[in-house]
């Protein structure tokens, strides 16, 4: 395990029906393979020692004896391995036969979990051979494979890295799966040993069932189904295998492979535990559902020398979906923003809305949202007043794009230069206009806000804010300048997503003329334009040169807000996401570390700006509203977070 990740596997071995020696040999081979890959826990299918389709042979004492002796051989084989294995085996106890999962590690059975729900309908006849775990009550102690073992459905297994529970096949399909109670009792991971036969359409249904259960429980879910070698007398077993985490699919086996399969991935236990802490309904369910008392079985510490390798992809753009989902998400977001703005317009009986249009991404998105809201309200777009306020740093490119876009969208255009007022303000302050410091920059931002506020009052409207989530996180806004408005439609939209929203609007909301303007806005460097342009009239003050790439900062922000990860873990994930092999830009580790330190320093010092934010709609999983998702003291110290990144050897992080 490293940085909260645990490596697990689902195995689909080749079997021979009722040939326990053959089956155990193949299980041993796959256990050794898993151990060599640094896999901590491996799950095999239901009744994998005997094969599932033995039918009435389960009533033969010879088969039961062979199963026990073969399992004993497997236990001995595990003595020198680090991997924990879950294998399926029939176990006779008190004149009853139970379909069990045996949890074995380093030469010992740590527990037996019997199946609870026995299907006895259509093609299933399990009650003909097996007894439900309910017959055991809270469980039993029995002699098996030369040791005394607990057999109960109320078992949790605790390693040094996670807690897991076990259910078997039909248990998942039941109205009240055992995994519900196992998760509420503390299981981070659920392992399912299965032998579910194939039917038309069943595979998709099963996948959804697994994904939904993992999401409902905020759990990892590892499913191993019987495959090639099971009897095809009446049914077909395709060898389905899945590894899921909180509704997401990490790995999936090949159906009908006609060969053995070992799928593996790393489950983020830290992430699952963070989700459960944040969701108060999870803790509430523990009381409401009267979770039964579980016995916790401690496993030996995992001490493999195999270097940990993170194989699962880490999305460099967690706020931005890929493929067809991007267009769907963009449309949904714009609809949410415009719905919120429309409601505020109606509630305030506003005659107009006023937006400062700079020719940049944020003000463009706010304008597009306003247009969408007015169209839905069936109002004349001329009720949207776009004010462009050129200043000392305004370039021809952004000015032209601002005016062209307003013309193309048919909104009311006003142009008010801030230069005269700010120049007078500098004189009043005694500030040298040639000194381009914070006073020089902030005076311009506050003058623009004053114009917008007064114009809104003049025209019976309100100011629509343009600032986005990324700027709020970094405090990249002038206090009581662009930081302030009367309704902030972009307040929970990160910068990396803003660009995609404007590009989506260019494809779906624009005519040919406005499309060209929107695409040029997307291609324009991000800048507040508070410093004069260079000698060629180009933007001199590039935001990402000053505070760092938004691609990185949005990644840092997501894992800070969404899961509360430590700086070290965020650095670890970022190095994987931005190593050039994923969907992100390649950044050197020292660059990532540099901007991560900047992020945490600014995130803490700039909270005072977020403590007095205007209203604005939440549209995604992350928000910094002081009335909703993020309540943080403005004078909190960042020392512990920065110290977490201070190590002599950065490779240790």
Predicted regions and their residues:
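ATP/NTP-dependent adenylation/nucleotidyl-transfer catalytic domains that generate, transfer
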Residues: 18, 160, 219, 228-231, ...
């Amino acid at each position: 395990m490293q940085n909260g990740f645990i490596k697990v596997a689902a195995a689909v071995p080749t079997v021979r029906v009722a040939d326990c020696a053959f089956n155990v040999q193949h299980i041993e081979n796959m256990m050794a393979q898993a151990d060599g890959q640094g896999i901590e826990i491996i799950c095999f299918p239901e009744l994998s020692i005997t094969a599932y389709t033995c039918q009435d042979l389960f009533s033969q004492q010879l088969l039961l004896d062979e199963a026990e002796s073969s399992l004993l051989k497997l236990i001995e084989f595990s003595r020198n391995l680090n991997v924990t294995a879950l294998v399926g085996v029939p176990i006779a106890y008190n004149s009853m036969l139970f379909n069990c999962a045996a949890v074995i590690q380093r030469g010992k059975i740590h527990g037996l979990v019997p199946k609870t729900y026995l299907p006895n309908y259509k093609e299933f006849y399990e009650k003909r051979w097996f007894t439900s775990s309910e017959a055991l009550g809270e469980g039993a102690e029995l002699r098996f494979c030369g040791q005394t073992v607990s057999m109960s459905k109320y078992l949790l297994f605790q390693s040094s890295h996670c807690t897991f529970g076990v259910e078997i096949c039909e248990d998942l399909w039941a109205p009240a799966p055992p995994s519900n109670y196992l998760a509420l009792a503390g299981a981070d991971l659920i392992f399912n040993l299965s032998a579910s036969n194939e039917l038309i359409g069943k595979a998709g249904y099963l996948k959804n069932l697994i994904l939904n259960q993992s999401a409902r429980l905020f759990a990892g879910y590892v499913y191993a189904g019987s495959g090639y070698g099971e009897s095809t007398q009446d049914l077909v077993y395709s060898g389905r295998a899945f590894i899921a985490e909180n509704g997401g699919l990490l790995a999936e086996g090949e159906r009908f492979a006609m060969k053995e399969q070992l799928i593996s991935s790393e489950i983020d236990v830290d992430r699952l535990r963070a989700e459960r802490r944040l969701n108060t309904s999870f803790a509430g369910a523990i009381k409401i559902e009267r979770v039964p008392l579980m016995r916790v079985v401690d496993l030996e510490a995992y001490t493999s020398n195999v270097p940990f390798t993170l194989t699962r992809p880490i999305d460099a753009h967690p706020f931005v979906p890929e493929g067809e989902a991007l267009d769907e998400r963009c449309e949904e977001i714009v609809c949410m923003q415009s719905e919120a703005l429309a409601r505020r317009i109606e509630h305030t009986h506003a005659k107009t809305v006023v937006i400062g249009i700079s020719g940049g991404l944020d003000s463009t998105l706010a304008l597009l949202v306003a247009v969408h809201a007015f169209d839905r309200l069936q109002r004349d777009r001329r009720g949207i007043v776009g004010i462009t306020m050129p200043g000392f740093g305004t370039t021809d490119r952004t000015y032209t794009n601002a005016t062209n876009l307003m013309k193309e969208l048919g909104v009311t255009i006003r142009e008010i230069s801030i230069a005269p007022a700010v120049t007078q303000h500098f004189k009043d302050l005694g500030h040298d206009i040639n000194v381009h410091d914070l006073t020089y920059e902030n005076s311009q931002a506050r003058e623009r806000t004053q114009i917008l506020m007064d114009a809104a009052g003049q025209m019976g409207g309100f100011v629509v804010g343009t600032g986005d989530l990324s700027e709020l996180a970094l405090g990249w806004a002038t206090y009581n300048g662009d930081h302030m408005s009367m309704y902030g439609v972009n307040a929970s939209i990160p910068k990396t997503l803003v660009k995609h929203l404007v590009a989506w609007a260019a494809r779906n909301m624009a005519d040919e003329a406005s499309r060209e303007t929107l695409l040029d806005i997307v291609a324009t460097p991000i800048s507040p334009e508070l410093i004069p342009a260079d000698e060629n009239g180009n933007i001199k003050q590039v935001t990402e040169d000053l505070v760092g790439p938004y691609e990185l900062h949005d990644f840092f922000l997501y894992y800070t807000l969404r899961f509360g990860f430590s700086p070290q873990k965020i650095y670890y994930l970022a190095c994987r996401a931005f190593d050039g092999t994923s969907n992100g830009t390649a950044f050197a580790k020292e660059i990532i570390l540099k901007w991560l330190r900047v992020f945490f320093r600014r995130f803490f010092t700039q909270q005072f700006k977020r403590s007095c934010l205007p209203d604005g709609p939440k549209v995604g999983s992350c928000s910094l509203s002081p009335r909703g998702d993020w309540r943080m003291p403005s004078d909190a110290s960042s020392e512990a977070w920065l110290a977490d990144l201070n190590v002599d050897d950065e490779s240790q992080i």
